Amino acid sequence: MNRLSTKLVVAIGIGSALYGILGLWGFSIAPNTFIKPALAILTVFGALFGPVAGLLIGLIGHTVTDTIAGWSIWWGWVISSGIIGFTMGFIQKRVGFSVKNGTYNKGDISYLAITGLIGIVIAIIFAGAFDIIVMGEPFDKIVIQVLGATIADVIVFLVLGLPITIGLAKSNKKHTHLKIEK
């Protein structure tokens, strides 16, 4: 069985705290649905530390947000944050990709974009279905929430998460195009 390294546990703790606290702020776009810039944390930490870290940061961080805000914990949405973090972490498993070393190519960026978008859609549909089936929420309300949350998460992912992750990788590149003249 693989054990979590100290570094990974610390990263999960920091990522969860950041995601949990930053998740308290957002812009309302539908009933109980917000554009939350905190989603970028799942992209960055998933790309840096992998799917397990992304999953745990999403689960723990969203639980922290709901607890601090005083809302009851909406487990379908907590799990959806975990799913999003998990799928954002797939990129870290690609050979040749490393935010830490600044190694990536256009295919890696496309892969992150596609897996991120698919993960968001799957996660939000899961949360909506969970709310209808388990929580007994009205279908009409959930359709609005699912559409709003999907649009909001896609915007944050494309405008913040993806560019920040690419920017971090670029800043960590080990080589430049500068040449030493003799």
From Swiss-Prot:
Protein name, UniProt field: UPF0397 protein BA_2640/GBAA_2640/BAS2460
Keywords: Cell membrane, Membrane, Transmembrane, Transmembrane helix
Organism: Bacillus anthracis
GO cellular component, one term: plasma membrane
Protein's UniProt keywords contain Cytoplasm: no
Top-level taxonomy: Bacteria, Bacillati, Bacillota, Bacilli, Bacillales
Sequence similarity: Belongs to the UPF0397 family.
Topology of the protein relative to the lipid bilayer: Multi-pass membrane protein
Residue ranges the record marks as coiled coil: none
Membrane-spanning parts: 9-29, 40-60, 71-91, 114-134, 142-162
Subcellular location: Cell membrane
InterPro entries: ECF_substrate-spec-like, UPF0397
NCBIfam families: PRK13661.1
